[in-house]
Amino acid sequence: MYIEEVKGEMNLPENVRIFDTTLRDGEQTPGVALTVEEKTGIARKLDALGVDTIEAGFPAASPGEMNSIRRIVELGLEANICGLARVLREDIDAAIDCGVDYIHTFIGTSPLHREYKLKMSPDEIIDRAVFGVEYAAEHGLKVEFSAEDATRTEFDYLVEVYRAAEDAGAEIINVPDTVGVMIPRAMNHLVSRLKEELRVPISVHCHNDFGLAVANSLAAVEAGASQVHATVNGLGERAGNAALEEVVMALITRYDLPVDIRTVELVNISEFVSKITGVRMPPNKAIVGENAFAHEAGIHVHGVLEKAETYEPITPEMVGHKRRIVLGKHTGANALRSKLQEYGIEMKEEQFCTLYEQVKRLGDKGKRITDADLRAMAVTILGKASREIVKLEGIAVMTGESVMPTATVKLRIGDEVKTTSMTGVGPVDAAINAIQSLVSETADIELDEYNIEAITGGTNALAEVFVVMSDGEGNKATGRSTREDIVMASVEAVLDAINKILSLK
């Protein structure tokens, strides 16, 4: 409604290209280091998603980086494969040796970079930029040029640098907000002015230091920028980059702009990248977070059940997500009835009231209630014995100063008894690894969360272990156990969760 009223004030491009830099800037996330196989796996996913350009890495960084980029080039993907390079002959040669068809070359231009990092005069920087762009263009590469720290560079000088790069053969001019200092109105103003000065398309690369990377990217598009740099899940240096999934969905649904992205794959690639990098997404992460389409409050759930649009701006299916009705202290009776109906569970009113009170009571205690937990509670109230599909028959653990922690576990799975031994970083890890190994033939169930808390003091303190486990079908279950023995408490909690998940099948 209100967006339509202001669209006339925007200088929107005909379409927006997505330049993905997950494999370059995203890999610079502190603590993230990807193998060749992991990088090629992500590249395949990005290509299937439909991004226009994949920045595969920084070829001059190391021989291993060059090898990764070569492997990605050899995949023969639809996307342009780009390499990052400083405006140096050796950097550009490294990119050429990798076989990329696109180069993103840069040099710092702000007073800070000129004086402290580069120790070069403004004219020297322009000369270096021109050399780099010309050298890359002469070798048949498509050239995108960035003035690093552009948003802290004097405007007249910035235009001078960009025009020189443009005249030297740059086909795209990129505006990096290198340390995320811009606000949307300022970014819009800057890009609008640059559009008046330059001939080639303008791109933006926004960092998220103040949480404004996506907003600044969209503000640039409103001013006419036709390409956005982004990363899956917003990965990147410090606070990260503009999140690809957020930029894409905003462009498509808020601006009605054509973007060649298969949006139904967004959750899939988000989870894939999260798993490979080890960077977990907050549950409330926009578009792809676990809670992006989750509803607990009774009023909200009632509205969503009547018409999803009341509390959802887009359908979860559009991005490959699922709507979830979450149970907790804010849950209303309608939500609970809907959940029971979903699982085909029928209850008398008295039984329903008992279950409803239990849900509220657990919610007030801050306990998480998964669908599998609900089903287990309902089965108990209905007087039906819950199936203990996996039962512990025996366990022995060995650990010590010079001994690899090892656990031997015997489980009864259905009518079959199985035994295995596994190692781990400690006896608890070894025991859980052994259980997962034995159960893997029945179902692919993974440990998502593990928490332990001492309830009492002393060396014989009671420990409460809480776990969250999930399978490949999106089912989650919690498990709890309280024991003096931490290993046994952990084993019982894991088996509790596993049995809840298996009971859903």
From Swiss-Prot:
Start and end residues of each Pyruvate carboxyltransferase domain: 16-265
GO molecular function: 2-isopropylmalate synthase activity; metal ion binding
Stored Pfam families: HCS_D2, HMGL-like, LeuA_dimer
UniProt key word Endoplasmic reticulum: no
Binding site for a divalent metal cation: D25, H205, H207, N241
GO BP terms in the entry: L-leucine biosynthetic process
Keywords assigned by UniProt, alphabetized: Amino-acid biosynthesis, Branched-chain amino acid biosynthesis, Leucine biosynthesis, Metal-binding, Transferase
InterPro entries named among the record's database cross-references: 2-isopropylmalate_synth_dimer, AIPM/Hcit_synth_CS, Aldolase_TIM, LEU1_arch, LeuA/HCS_post-cat, LeuA_allosteric_dom_sf, PYR_CT
Pathway(s) of this molecule: Amino-acid biosynthesis; L-leucine biosynthesis; L-leucine from 3-methyl-2-oxobutanoate: step 1/4
Reactions that this protein is recorded to catalyse: 3-methyl-2-oxobutanoate + acetyl-CoA + H2O = (2S)-2-isopropylmalate + CoA + H(+)
EC number(s) per entry: 2.3.3.13
Keyword Phosphoprotein attributed: no
Cofactor(s) the protein requires to work: a divalent metal cation
Primary role: Catalyzes the condensation of the acetyl group of acetyl-CoA with 3-methyl-2-oxobutanoate (2-oxoisovalerate) to form 3-carboxy-3-hydroxy-4-methylpentanoate (2-isopropylmalate).
PANTHER family, sorted: (R)-CITRAMALATE SYNTHASE CIMA (PTHR42880:SF2), HOMOCITRATE SYNTHASE (PTHR42880)
Subunit structure as annotated in this protein's UniProt entry: Homodimer.
Similarity field: Belongs to the alpha-IPM synthase/homocitrate synthase family.
Protein name: Probable 2-isopropylmalate synthase
Organism (species): Methanothermobacter thermautotrophicus (strain ATCC 29096 / DSM 1053 / JCM 10044 / NBRC 100330 / Delta H)
